[in-house]
Regions:
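His/Glu-based metal-binding/catalytic segments typifying zinc-dependent metallopeptidases
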Residues: 1-27
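A contiguous, surface-exposed recognition patch within enzymatic or periplasmic domains that forms
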Residues: 30
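Acidic/polar-rich alpha-helix caps and helix-coil junctions
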Residues: 1-5, 33-225
Length: 225
């Protein structure tokens, strides 16, 4: 099992302090509608947030609250979970994307099966006819965008986004217009982040310890010293 959230109990305050790995950008928050069963499970709205000493109110990831079977007592949360290596919802997403890649007019059926299972209305082909321009300037079909958005909702904060972008041949640009923008603006390294498709930064560097111990590795991955 694994712990997705760093957490601790603050007895003087009578509340938990937890530190999610991610801050959702505004375009992610907008993906979640009120009718979506996942909205109140995956997101914590109106959360009191502290970033580098600056305090504010915003939206946080709250997807992994913890498996009760891993609790050591009834009062202390440990936020521990059994990682799901593969879920049935991923099969619907894979099916939708695979059908679309074989035929750009296909893929709507498995997409709608997942959407309706999550409380969303089914889409018609007329809903996804128009091309969509992404934040990084990439233009894709409306259907492929709907498939990507559904994957973004279902797989939120599960570590698949990097691999999705590589598979789709897309870059990304940080959307600084987040619910936490006033706090993010005070932390310079959080303000800008842009990588084009095919950037060497999509591949992690080889750890220095591995390079030192095994000279057969040769040179470091492109883009790293």
């Amino acid at each position: 099992f694994g712990s997705y959230l760093n957490s601790s109990w603050k007895p003087n305050l009578g509340e938990y302090f937890y530190a999610p790995t991610y801050i959702p950008e505004q375009h992610i928050v907008k993906l979640f509608k009120d009718a979506d069963f996942r909205t109140d499970i995956f997101l914590v709205k109106n959360a009191n947030v502290t970033i580098s000493g600056s305090k504010g109110v915003g939206v946080l990831i709250g997807k992994f609250r913890g498996n009760k079977n891993f609790q050591t007592n009834t009062t202390t949360l440990v936020y521990r979970n059994r990682p799901k290596m593969f879920r049935i919802s991923q099969m619907y997403l894979v099916d939708a994307e695979a059908q679309y890649r074989l035929d750009p007019s296909k893929g709507l059926d498995p997409l709608n099966q997942l959407r309706t299972a999550r409380g969303l209305a089914a889409l018609a082909m007329s809903d996804v006819e128009k091309d969509v321009t992404l934040l990084d300037g990439t233009k894709i079909s409306g259907l492929f965008n709907a498939i990507q958005e559904e994957r973004g909702r279902e797989m939120l904060a599960e570590g698949t986004r990097l691999f999705d972008l590589k598979r789709w041949g897309q870059g990304f640009q940080r959307d600084v217009n987040t619910s936490l923008a006033p706090l993010v603006d005070k932390v310079s390294y959080l303000q800008t982040m842009k990588q084009t498709a095919g950037s060497p930064k999509f591949v992690w560097p080889i750890p220095n310890s591995e390079m030192t111990q095994n000279p057969n590795f040769g040179s470091q991955n492109q883009g790293y010293l």
